[in-house]
Each structure stands twice: as C-alpha cells, then as structure tokens.
Design a protein with these regions (language model features):
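N-terminal, polar/charged subdomain of small-to-medium soluble alpha/beta proteins
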Residues: 1-118
C-alpha cells in the first residue's frame, strides 16, 4: 500500500518572474504539494505516525514569501528539497502554476513540476 498526502491549489500572491511587470505588479500563483510519507500505513491513529499537512502548508508559504525568485523552477526545487530534508517523506512532488504568465495568447496556465526522491 502506498499513501500520498496532497495539498491542492494553494493560492498565493507573489512577485516571482523574470519580467519587470511580474516583479513590480505581482500575480497569483497556484501550488500543489504531494508527499509520500516514510510510514505508508500508520500503525495507530496518531499524527506523529505521519506528516502533518498543516506544517507542509506553512513550509510552502514561508519559502514562497521569504524572497523573490526569477524562476518558478528554482522555487519548486527549493520547496521540494526543504520538504524532503525536513520531513519524514520518501518523495515530494511540487507543481507551481502561473495562471497569468506574460504570454500573448490563450492558455490556462504555465506550469512546472519537480519531483524529489529521497
């Protein structure tokens, strides 16, 4: 059995990107996190047996807000590396979307996905 803990569509406003408008005006970002805890199946009904998703959420918002990033790829890597090094997980997948990326044309979003395995 494999357990996955997911937080979908964390919405945060930030000033990440390479363009001047992105850096001055900012935009909405959407972030998904998926982790596989070391203990796939907890042996008791105890939070200490797994990964507390409220801590994962706090980790994401802290890293996102701590500084401005040019590349969302680098930001996604930073989040994934921090989570895999700080929490008892076998893997961490981070997806970051820019719904309003500065591209002329019709599209839903620009997205990067990073997977970090321990």
């Amino acid at each position: 059995m494999e357990t996955k803990i997911k937080i979908n569509n964390i919405q945060l406003f930030g000033y990440h990107g390479t363009g001047e408008k992105e850096k001055s005006t900012g935009q909405l970002f959407e972030i998904d996190i998926e982790v596989s805890p070391v203990n796939d199946t907890p042996i008791s009904d105890n939070l200490a047996q797994t990964v507390d998703y409220t801590l994962l959420y706090d980790e994401v918002t802290t890293i996102f807000s701590k500084r401005r990033y040019n590349l969302i790829e680098y930001l996604a890597n930073k989040i994934a590396d921090t989570i895999t090094n700080k929490y008892r997980v076998n893997s961490c997948k981070v997806v970051i979307r820019k719904p309003n990326a500065p591209i002329k044309g019709d599209f839903d979003s620009v997205e990067v996905e990073v997977i970090s395995n321990v």
